[in-house]
From Swiss-Prot:
Keyword Mitochondrion: yes
N-acetylalanine: residues bearing it: 2
Quaternary structure, from the entry: Heterohexamer; composed of 3 copies of TIMM9 and 3 copies of TIMM10/TIM10A, named soluble 70 kDa complex. The complex forms a 6-bladed alpha-propeller structure and associates with the TIMM22 component of the TIM22 complex. Interacts with multi-pass transmembrane proteins in transit. Also forms a complex composed of TIMM9, TIMM10/TIM10A and FXC1/TIM10B.
Gene3D superfamilies documented for this protein: Mitochondrial import inner membrane translocase subunit tim13 like domains
Extent of motif Twin CX3C motif: 28-52
Disulfide bond residue pairs: 28-52, 32-48
Taxonomic source organism: Homo sapiens
Function: Mitochondrial intermembrane chaperone that participates in the import and insertion of multi-pass transmembrane proteins into the mitochondrial inner membrane. May also be required for the transfer of beta-barrel precursors from the TOM complex to the sorting and assembly machinery (SAM complex) of the outer membrane. Acts as a chaperone-like protein that protects the hydrophobic precursors from aggregation and guide them through the mitochondrial intermembrane space.
Gene name tied to this protein: TIMM9
Entry GO MF terms: membrane insertase activity; protein homodimerization activity; protein-folding chaperone binding; zinc ion binding
Protein's recorded name: Mitochondrial import inner membrane translocase subunit Tim9
Main location group: mitochondrion
Tissue specificity comment: Ubiquitous, with highest expression in heart, kidney, liver and skeletal muscle.
Length: 89
């Protein structure tokens, strides 16, 4: 049975998600939308926005992978250190 996440943690995670979403939306909008003379979204604005989002997602994925690799290395180092400390001399 999966453990339930406390409501306060769920709220915190949701607030973090909204903050990230808002920052990404603002960044891509400011980078991609330059002309307000029409109600229509121009093809180049759509393309720019898609590239902006893809770049952000790739960056986030890469950071997550590096973070995971770092933690694996730290755990291995701790395990090796614990193994050395546990051995008689």
């Amino acid at each position: 049975m999966a453990a339930q996440i406390p409501e306060s943690d769920q709220i915190k995670q949701f607030k973090e998600f909204l903050g990230t979403y808002n920052k990404l939306t603002e960044t891509c909008f400011l980078d991609c939308v330059k002309d307000f003379t029409t109600r229509e979204v121009k093809p180049e604005e759509t393309t720019c926005s898609e590239h902006c989002l893809q770049k952000y997602l790739k960056m986030t994925q890469r950071i997550s992978m590096r973070f995971q690799e770092y933690h694996i290395q730290q755990n291995e180092a701790l395990a090796a250190k614990a193994g050395l400390l546990g051995q008689p001399r």
